[in-house]
């Protein structure tokens, strides 16, 4: 495994008004960028079934991201990407709205002989005061204790023994560590803020 390059990961999470507990939520949408750049913008959907996770993504432009934040979803309905069209339905019919921005630095490692990816997420923090993932000036709140990070081990078929042997005994069981939940809970004092006062509207189908 060659020495990886760290990168900044900034993600705006969207959820339903009545479902904010990331532990029970089986489906989450998010818009992700890297290093505060608009070179790559992804709309992602993460589905969870028991301990297994399935991810899909579709590309967005900066202009499209701005339109989504402004509550303009019409372009999603006519997108060539099915994920965008389904996101349109979620926003219009199920009132899906942005809830929190999750920021962190990631160090990725990939095992050459297999489909194993190990990531170390450091300086995990919740951005508050807005949902513009490109705004690097938003205030942030750290969510982890000093000296701690989130390690994720991702694999598609099986976890090689060489990797399993590196993990502490208790970590060899499948567990969930949601950065979304950590950040949402950290910013919980803002829950009295009325999201619907920010110009959000529900467009007609």
Describe the function of each predicted region.
Residues 1-205:
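Phosphate-end processing signature that detects enzymes handling 5′-triphosphorylated RNA
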